[in-house]
Structures are given as C-alpha cells and as structure tokens.
C-alpha cells in the first residue's frame, strides 16, 4: 500500500493484507475492500498515519476503501451525510471519511471513499480501548446475532431491563449499560436521513 498525501509526499508505504468487503456492493466495480497492517508481510501491525484530520489520531489498524455501497452512482451519499453530522456538534459516533484517488498496479480506478473501520478496531482508534476491554456484536438477516469480541452478558441484561424501562430502578441500571443520549441521537439520525439499509441490516454495537 502506498498513500500519497495531497502535497505529493509519500506519507505511508508498507505491505498490507487486502480483503474484499461489502454485501450487495461486491457486485459493483471498483470493489470495496479492507486494508490491514501485517507484520508477517514485513510491514507494521498498524498504519501509522493520521488519514482522518477531523479526529485526534491514536492509531489505525485497518482501513476501509468503499465504492459507495448501494449508492453506486455518485458514491458520496453516506460519506457526505456522516461528514455533515460530524460537523453539526451532535454527540454521536461515526466513521470519518477521506476521498481518495485509487490506483491498482498503476491503473486508475476512480475516486473512492477511505473510511474508518466500523468494527472492534474503531474503539481503539477513537477511545484507546483494546478489544479485551469491550463487548462488540453485529446483527444481520443472513448471520443473525454474532458476538465479535467479549461476551453478550451486558446486551442480554439490557434487553431484559428494556422490557420494564418505565421503572426508575430498571432505568437507572439501563443508564449504566447504555449512553442513552448518544443512543437517542443515533436513532434520530438514522430515521432523519432515511437509511433504508437499516434496522433490518447493519446493526452493530
């Protein structure tokens, strides 16, 4: 992987793993994929460069190069919406975005979206927490509930408490498990932008 900054300097040059990414969007070209640092290939475990200037830099272990997902026409809808929300002052976690010109073996592929990962590595990149310190899951129609790291105890307890959320004692315990303000902001934003690939898909927590 070679990353040339806007000023023309070689900002990063190292061997990485390349992995195809996306669901339905795998059928579209250019393809979406993930880049992962790998010591075994003679590179580094991390990708040590601040690709996303809108957030403080801690480290990057993986990057997503996206073709726009289901937005295959202009390819910027998701990135534009997240950028607008990011600069709005709303308290909500989201993936930073950087447009890039992609070349593969010298062949120009077009303008794609470089994004932060939306997996366990996101937590370290934004909060400095290792995967041993978190519980992370994903849900989709194809896979159902999948525990990515940690365990499901806190999520199961949250579901139990939610059935009786009007009870003050239960609600106070919910507040210990869930950032309720950010959760409300998240739900409001998904509904406001009209995300049609959610909530039946793309659930992560």
Question: Can you say where each PLM-predicted feature lies in the sequence?
Answer:
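Phosphate-handling architecture centered on phosphoinositide signaling
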Residues: 1-186
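Active-site acidic catalytic loop and adjacent metal/ATP-binding pocket
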Residues: 35, 178-205
